Amino acid sequence: MRLNLYHLLVLSFLSLITLFSCKGPSNSGELVGARLNKLKANKTPYGMVLIPGGTFIMGQSDEDITFSQTAQNRQVTIASFYMDDTEISNSEYRQFVNWVRDSILITNFLGDDSYFIESSSGERFIDWNKVGKNSPWRSNDENARERLSSMYYQGEDRIFGKNELDVRLLKYHYEWFDLRAATSARGDRTKSRSDFIIRDTMLIYPDTTVWLNDFSYAQNEPMVEGYFSHPSFDEYPVVGVTWRQAQAFNTWRTRLFNNAASSNKTMERLPYQLPSEAEWEYAARGGKVGMQFPWGGPTARNARGCLMANFKPGRGNYIDDGNAYTAPVYSYFPNDFGLYNMAGNVAEWTQSSYNESANSFVHDMNPTYTYNAKATDNEALKRKVIRGGSWKDIGFFLQNGARQYEYQDTAKSYIGFRSVTRYVGVSN
């Protein structure tokens, strides 16, 4: 018995040697490949759902009642991607605002080196673990409280001496590499990499005055004062955010995850960004063919007569769906992909620039049309596609194929956004 066990161990050892020798050592002179870190499986990002790739007919699914012909039908193919299951909420966007607020306080005002860590190259970075455990905003130290008071409104800007954050200080600097511009100039040897790095600095606090700007002679002051700052609205969609602010948010969100991945020695994620309008429409349809709405159709009510989304069902009637303004982001039933409020609640920014005939000339594989408009460009070049309709829109704009636009520097009380990120590999 002991001899048989010995023979078994010897055979097992020889089998392992044979197995590993078949793979070919790196110094064998054979082409064996240089593999990157092993990735067991794509993990769905928190708060997102996988949108499996497929093909669909993009454009109007019903009569073009305005006869605008801006959403011509076209069969296209979309690769797999991840998408937020809801619109970005006030609480999620506030995490971004608080990060910028704390960064500015620690870097420019606090003067406390204990909130920094130093890398091996000598660079200093904020220690976010310490910020989370010992936030300077909760400090009882008299010197620290005096320094952080610099971030409040000062002098005549104060009301009854109340400490209120001066949101004009909340600016976020971000950078990104313009791949399309670099590709177009790939044969130009006079260009360097820095020529294609776009740098921008944005005020990132939402414009709360949109509730008054968008509606004349309407008593919306309570929404100005509480919509973004009151905890009752935490799970409502953020509004008053421009297209450029949404871009800044996605850059920050990408860095937030990738910095954590670097610390944990795990795989980084491809950038978060706004969906193209083709991706948005494909996701909104939820795999249904030729349907008007994310839930199917042909009406905006279910068999019991209940409205399926938050919109304006009749003249002067905003509240038949149960909400006078926006609704919480998990309201109503999701579509077949698990996405909430792809019709109504708030219209959503997309990555795509608006062109009336875009459906006619974009590619039939992952179609998109983008243009990085500068401040000096013509206003028509600053138009960005918005999709889905909103709480103040009539039912026509809730259709999957309905297209609208808004200018990239414009904030509205009825426009929000959600993010996507790429699925790496093949999903089926």
For each predicted feature, which ranges?
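A short glycine-rich, aromatic-capped structural motif
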Residues: 41-230, 234-246, 344
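Short, P/G- and charge-enriched loop/turn segments at secondary-structure junctions
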Residues: 36-38, 70-71, 371-374, 403-408
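C-terminal motif of bacterial Sec signal peptides marking the signal peptidase cleavage site
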Residues: 19-21
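Hydrophobic helical h-region of N-terminal Sec-dependent signal peptides
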Residues: 10-14
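N-terminal pre-domain segments of enzymes
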Residues: 25-41
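Functional-site microenvironments in short loops/helix caps that host divalent-cation chemistry
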Residues: 23-30, 50-51, 57, 62, ...
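Bacterial N-terminal signal peptides that target proteins for export
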Residues: 2-9
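Short, structured beta-strand segments at or near domain termini in extracellular proteins/domains
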Residues: 413-428
